[in-house]
Amino acid sequence: MARAVGIDLGTTNSVVAVLEGGDPVVVANSEGSRTTPSVVAFARNGEVLVGQPAKNQAVTNVERTMRSVKRHMGGDWSIEIDDKKYTTPEISARVLMKLKRDAEAYLGEDIADAVITVPAYFNDAQRQATKDAGQIAGLNVLRIVNEPTAAALAYGLDKGEKDQTILVFDLGGGTFDVSLLEIGEGVVEVRATSGDNHLGGDDWDDRVVEWLVDKFKGTSGIDLTKDKMAMQRLREAAEKAKIELSSSQSTSINLPYITVDADKNPLFLDEQLTRAEFQRITQDLLDRTRKPFQSVIADTGISVSDIDHVVLVGGSTRMPAVTELVKELTGGKEPNKGVNPDEVVAVGAALQAGVLKGEVKDVLLLDVTPLSLGIETKGGVMTKLIERNTTIPTKRSETFTTADDNQPSVQIQVYQGEREIAAHNKLLGSFELTGIPPAPRGVSQIEVTFDIDANGIVHVTAKDKGTGKENTIRIQEGSGLSKDEIDRMIKDAEAHAAEDHKRREEADVRNQAETLVYQTEKFVKEQREAEGGSKVPEDTLNKVDAAVAEAKSALAGTDIAAIKSAMEKLGQESQALGQAIYEATQADAAAAGAPGGQPGGAEPGADDVVDAEVVDDDQESK
């Protein structure tokens, strides 16, 4: 069965993790890094670059490089490249495809399932767009999980013996969340969450860019905002400066040849940015994190002193000003620093993927009922309908009410297990009852029925008792994109993957051919320049020269089949040359005789073999 992974699809960087022997492991990408920049670029030769390679070429390919697209998730943003429109889910899918490939390379097997995290403050459209991106990337998205919940799982705080109140402060590249969770005796409950989907590290970078633009304009009179390439260089320098100021009191920003003046003379940007100045120009951004924190505290009605642990998530929380603000808001509590804030969410997602793996859609097949069967109800609680050790066949029903006013549908999630919180049990499947008439919360009555036959097959139905409407089990794939659009994007992604494979194969063939040409030319040259002349006839060397010329001619073109053919011929001629040299060397040795008077240069008895043991001195001395 294919493995499932946990993915943190971030604004600035993305991370993938997988369970190995029950423990989560962050997977390094093909470039050797544990984080992958969420950057996608369309090169002019048709190649699509993702991650660090895309980020590296951004300066020279500004208009065809996409970054921070997560900020547009769920909206109608799109970009047109070479007369083709790309949506946010499509661009995000490119990042997910790379993470998928890197994880498959690490595991040595295919990956089909994934848990993908989103900010807790994401709305339904943003969550669906994230799920669409996963589908386009060829992933079966088991669940969209809130980042604070994943972070709490990764920190292992859900294993505490006593009740604990956890504050998760998540400041990423483009979004901000603060959530309060109550944890105890295996129960994990999100009490309240608040945030800002347009506040993150990118905004701090933008302030530094604005500061640099103003400084340069003041000294040169030139407005760099009109130069896209210069602005990309400023953005990269700003991000680097922000990171350096987390550990230093000041940093130098030096960008040679940033632009030219009216006389075409090159101009240089050289500024010194102190941590104090950086904090001054970004103070209002920091202050924007206060209101969501205060909102969460007010919504739960707890005191700041009741917070037991503070968890920092997201690379932007490394900024000293952010850490100090969190300590101030929480009454001086030191944040928990047990896990890398860049990786903690992906680690939690991998743990959640381990919980959810094994889901079967539409038909739930159980060999026996050793564990209780139930559904998730409000607060994430596991409500049991059939207790463990129940004799089958059996049929049980229970009536539930809606949790919100005018709730139009009910998502029925079926679990197996004994834990009190549904998420801690095994998710077997889910389906949705739609078309519930508008009514205040608690008025609509939904009857859920579990029917287990003698074969152990479980059938689950949900019925609105008011209208008599009944739905069969089906996984609802409601989408911001139509099914046809998603199918088209999936096919495009698959075709692109095939193109990538072809390009890599072509590059490998070219590299092999070029290496063979170089080595062969060098070998032939050494033979001709050898003392006493070459040991093989000139016509043999000429044949090799001809094969080398043919290979070079093929390499100058684009026909890979021709390159392979020329390389094969060159390989044969090279082998023939090697054989000729070997035979010539043997003939010379035979003609000259050898020490000891034996033809062929062997001493008498040289063919005798002596058996011996190799003794380890250390072992012998013991």
UniProtKB/Swiss-Prot annotation:
Entry annotated with the keyword ATP-binding: yes
Molecular function per GO: ATP binding; ATP-dependent protein folding chaperone; unfolded protein binding
Name of one Pfam family that matches: HSP70
Keywords of the record: ATP-binding, Chaperone, Nucleotide-binding, Phosphoprotein, Stress response
Chain segments annotated as transmembrane: none
Biased composition (Gly residues): 594-603
Induction (UniProt): By stress conditions e.g. heat shock.
Region called Disordered, residue ranges: 589-608
Residues the record lists as Phosphothreonine modifications: T175
Homology family: Belongs to the heat shock protein 70 family.
Role this protein plays: Acts as a chaperone.
Protein name, as recorded: Chaperone protein DnaK
Organism for this UniProt entry: Mycobacterium ulcerans (strain Agy99)
